[in-house]
A protein has these predicted regions:
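Extracellular beta-strand-rich solenoid/capping regions of secreted or surface-exposed proteins
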Residues: 62, 125-127, 150, 285, ...
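Acidic, glycine-rich low-complexity segments
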Residues: 106, 115-116, 126, 197, ...
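Short aromatic-glycine motifs in intrinsically disordered, low-complexity regions
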Residues: 31, 108-114, 203-205, 274-276, ...
Length: 321
């Protein structure tokens, strides 16, 4: 290990850190002190030298310290990127190289600064910030996001499942769930005000009342889990299957009925469908279809076939006086 100060120029910095297959000690941590900024304008590649410092794998980058690190070149390293503290700013496409796992610790921030980046898996702790900031983050193998996602831009899930539990109310971009991928959320704050383009699977796990205000489109499937009620309106534009596994899905209200565009709606044994409007496709009922909402004469329109699988249809009637 050789100490590198902020006064080193780029040539000396790259020489001392030994990123590019030189035959000396290598070290993958950038420790930037509070109020200091270090801009790395050279490309970082895997270090194949056997002489690596303190167990460094020669291909991973760690950002520590409360200062700011800027990566302003397209990089080629293939290991993990870990932001332990402070801020890491991207200033080039794929500035994180071909990162395997991206870790954000509590108190750390990654600012994508308008640039695209592809990684394998995202892992963020509560108290961290992922600022998409007009950029595009592509996940090939999902991950777990307990921190905050903010800004605009796009977060694309190409494979695996991304489980979001953080408060993302300041994210106004787009979640894209591609075929074979899965996005799981539990509260309105998990989605922020983002659009969702779903071509895979979206799980909405509501344990309490949730008015879904996000625009959701695509031919992917939507799964409703959790005992809470999910109220949807005309912003629900998906055409894939809707699977009500637990809890209730409420279509619109008396003044604004909703025709759900799903080609297939399945009400499971612990599920319920109610509200005003109908479904464009087939309806399979093993649970409850509740037409008792608010007033006698409520109508549920089914555009396809209705199949009862030991499910109940609840009706509200009125006798003449």
């Amino acid at each position: 290990y050789v100490y590198t100060s902020l006064n080193d120029d780029d040539n000396k910095l790259i020489s001392m850190l030994r990123w590019n297959n030189t035959k000396g000690m290598g070290y993958g941590t950038f420790n930037i002190e509070k109020d200091a900024t270090l801009n790395i304008g050279v490309s970082l590649s895997d270090n194949l030298s056997p002489l690596l410092y303190d167990g460094w794998d020669g291909k991973s980058l760690t950002k520590s310290g409360n200062g700011t690190l800027i990566l302003s070149a397209t990089n080629n390293y293939t290991g993990n990127t870990e932001v332990k503290s402070g801020v890491l700013i991207l200033a080039a496409p794929d500035a994180l190289g071909r990162t395997e796992y991206l870790y954000l610790s509590r108190g750390a921030e990654l600012d994508m600064n308008g640039y695209p980046q592809t990684i394998s898996k995202l892992l963020t702790a509560a108290g961290s910030v992922l600022n998409i900031h007009g950029g595009s983050l592509i996940l090939n193998n999902g991950g777990e996001s307990a921190g905050t996602i903010a800004g605009d831009g796009s977060l694309n899930i190409n494979g695996g499942m991304l489980d979001i539990t953080g408060n993302n109310r300041n994210f106004s971009g787009v979640f894209t769930v591609n075929k074979g991928a899965h996005l799981a959320v539990s509260t309105a704050d998990n989605l922020g005000t983002a659009f969702v383009d779903n071509y895979g699977t979206l799980t909405l796990n509501s344990t309490s009342a949730w008015q879904l205000t996000n625009n959701i489109s695509g031919y992917g499937n939507v799964r409703k889990t959790g005992a809470g009620a999910l109220n949807i309106s005309d912003n629900a534009k998906w055409t894939g299957m809707t699977d009500i596994i637990q809890g209730t899905v409420i279509l619109g209200n008396a003044d604004s009925p909703v025709m759900l565009g799903s080609n297939q709606v399945i009400v499971e044994e612990q599920g319920k469908l109610s509200g005003f409007g109908g479904v464009a496709g087939n309806l399979s009922n093993s649970g409850i279809v509740d037409l008792t909402t608010y007033m006698p004469g409520n109508i549920l329109t089914v555009g396809g076939n209705y199949t009862g699988r030991n499910g109940l249809i609840l009706l509200q009637t009125e006798t003449g006086g």
